[in-house]
Structures are given as structure tokens and as C-alpha cells.
Design a protein with these regions (language model features):
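Conserved N-terminal beta-strand and adjoining loop/helix that marks the start
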Residues: 1-18, 37-39, 69
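Acidic surface patches and DE-rich sequence motifs
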Residues: 13, 24, 75
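Conserved Nudix-box catalytic region and its N-terminal flanking loop in Nudix hydrolases
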Residues: 16-54
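Unchanged
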Residues: 38-62, 71-125, 159-161
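Nudix hydrolase/Nudix homology domain
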Residues: 28-31, 102-161
Length: 161
């Protein structure tokens, strides 16, 4: 079973929550917070800072959290993913999109009241925890677990455990 660790960042400004548009292999685009796979030997925060800068041009100078951790297993597709989500307490730089992986095609601060609508096109395991955090702004770390059934992204069924 393929396993990987992903870091995800919650960056807020007066304009809202930072979301990036990801062009998937099938050509579809969905929105998520910035982040990505943590390289072997990297700490989550080092890898997450790298991903945020690569995808958005912003440099995080202080982290809080983790806000939540997520565990998702897709037995049919043969993968297991762990996600650690941190809040950027402070950051600098100008927002720009220049993703070396070519996945991120847009980035913007989305007003908080619009986040649920923008995130509706992405997986439940992405938008559900973010929607809950935006609504509640909890302090203590939370944990989420999901099972993903099926082996084709477009028809996978996601269940919160």
C-alpha cells in the first residue's frame, strides 16, 4: 500500500482564507489550502513552508498548531494518506503562482463566508474539516478519519469514520 504524509496550511489575511486551484491529471480543477507531500527526511513544518512558498510565493515566518490531523485510507486504490494541518500565524511576501510541479494554477484569499462554496468541488475529506474550523475556530488539535472506497477518483465514495 502506498503511503504518504501531506502538510496543509491555513493562511488568513483581512481578505479571507488562502486557497489554491489545483489542476488534476484528468483536467479538472479543485480548490484546497496550499500544501503538499512532505519529502523523506523533511519535518512537516519545513516541508509545508517549502510547499507554501513554491505554490504561492508567500513565506511563513511563524506556525501554529497543528489545527487538525487527518487519516484517510483507500484500500481499493492502494493508498493511505496522513495530513497534518497547521495555521500560519505570520507570513510575508506577495501572492504569486509559479508552482514548479505545474499543479497549482491560481491562488487567492477567499472571503471566509465564501469558502464552503469554493471548496464544494473538492473531496469531502478536504472541505469538511476546513468548514468546521472556519465555523468554530477551535484551539485544541482535532483528528479526522476517512475511508475511501473505489479506485477511480471521480467515483470514489468517502466516508467519515
Amino acid at each position: 500500500m502506498r503511503q504518504w504524509l501531506v502538510g496543509s496550511a491555513l493562511l488568513e489575511s483581512d481578505d479571507g482564507l488562502l486557497l489554491v486551484a489545483n489542476r488534476r491529471r484528468d483536467g479538472n480543477v479543485d480548490w484546497t489550502p496550499p500544501g503538499g507531500v512532505i519529502d523523506d527526511g523533511e519535518s512537516v513544518l519545513v516541508g509545508l513552508a517549502r510547499e507554501v512558498e513554491e505554490e504561492t510565493g508567500l513565506v511563513v515566518t511563524e506556525w501554529g498548531g497543528p489545527v487538525y490531523r487527518l487519516d484517510a485510507e483507500a484500500v481499493d486504490a492502494g493508498w493511505h494518506m496522513q495530513v497534518e494541518v497547521h495555521r500560519a500565524v505570520a507570513f510575508t511576501g506577495e501572492l504569486r503562482v509559479d508552482d514548479p510541479d505545474g499543479i497549482v494554477v491560481d491562488a487567492r484569499f477567499v472571503p471566509v463566508e465564501e469558502c464552503s462554496a469554493v471548496l464544494a468541488s473538492t473531496w469531502q475529506l478536504v472541505h469538511e474539516p476546513i468548514a468546521e474550523w472556519v465555523a468554530e475556530r477551535w484551539v485544541d488539535e482535532r483528528r479526522y478519519r476517512y475511508r475511501v472506497d473505489g479506485d477511480v477518483r471521480a467515483s470514489m465514495v468517502i466516508t467519515r469514520l
